[in-house]
Amino acid sequence: MRQIGDSYVAKNAIVTGDVVLSAGVNIWFGCVLRGDLARITLGPRVNLQDGCIVHTDYGEPQVVEEGVVVGHRAVLHGKLIGHDTLVGMGAIVLSGAEIGHECVLAAGTLVTERRRIPPRSLVMGVPGKVVREVTDDDLRRTLSIAAHYLDMAQRYAKGAFPPPWGRPPGEGG
């Protein structure tokens, strides 16, 4: 994990083009961010877990606001992900979609093109449908995950974790 300014980016992550990283952003192993067609802006403490893809359409910038957590292998191709939203593992947000603040997109959810999701919505399914309002407990969980990943990124950057191949036998754990 390398530190770039106040952000943390895994050594094998690809960040190219017009991409703005705010303080505390943490981009994990195998992520690809392509700001080649329009700007991608990641707000403070955004967490992109392993294998995420973030891209845009030509001339349509994407903003991922403060405190957003994006689960493993999710794809963001939308316009806006509102603050403190959790995008579950493998979820897909298609072109021009706008996700309100404090939402939860369940794992595997597909948000279709140009769809607008209201704030504090729990969205599930293919295509994604709002199933209920996000509770305060749901929101606390998102905030906790964001804080946990930022802490881990800081520890990785300081060398607190072993190399990717792990520890040799007999060295404990």
Predicted regions and their residues:
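Left-handed beta-helix
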Residues: 5, 10-11, 16-17, 22-23, ...
